[in-house]
């Protein structure tokens, strides 16, 4: 509490934040879509091995959020301002990333959709219940 947080690229970064319930839902649905031995693999064209079919599937909403907006949601949920240590861009980092959930949606019909305005307060409430 009260410790400064490092904010890289002076907050001029975007990330695709995924709420835990969306992640669990995506994994649960993917488990039901797992290849079964001896049966044709649906969407096998994206599998890297015909012998042991497997996939890398992004689970994210594909909606990048500005880091400063994310921090603002945390501040709002906690009812106090963050102590920010503004830092330059770090070597090897990128200004924006987001998930492409097209394969997830094709396999399961699901795409994560919980906005940070819902997910961040829920996370903060959960944390407070357990650790405050």
Task: List where the protein language model places each region.
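C-terminal substrate-binding subdomain of Rossmann-fold SDR/epimerase-dehydratase oxidoreductases
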Residues: 1-132
């Amino acid at each position: 509490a009260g410790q400064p947080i490092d904010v890289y690229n002076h907050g001029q970064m975007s990330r695709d934040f995924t709420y835990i319930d969306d992640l669990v839902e995506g994994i649960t649905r993917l488990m039901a879509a797992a290849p079964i031995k001896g049966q044709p693999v649906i969407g096998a064209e994206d599998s890297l091995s015909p012998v042991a079919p497997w996939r890398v599937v992004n689970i994210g909403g594909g909606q990048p959020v500005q880091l400063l907006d994310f921090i603002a949601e945390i501040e709002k949920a906690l009812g106090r301002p963050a102590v920010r240590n503004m830092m330059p861009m770090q070597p090897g980092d990128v200004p924006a990333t987001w998930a492409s959930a097209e394969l997830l949606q094709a396999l399961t019909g699901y795409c994560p959709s919980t906005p940070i305005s819902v997910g961040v307060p829920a996370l903060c409430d959960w944390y407070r219940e357990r650790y405050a």
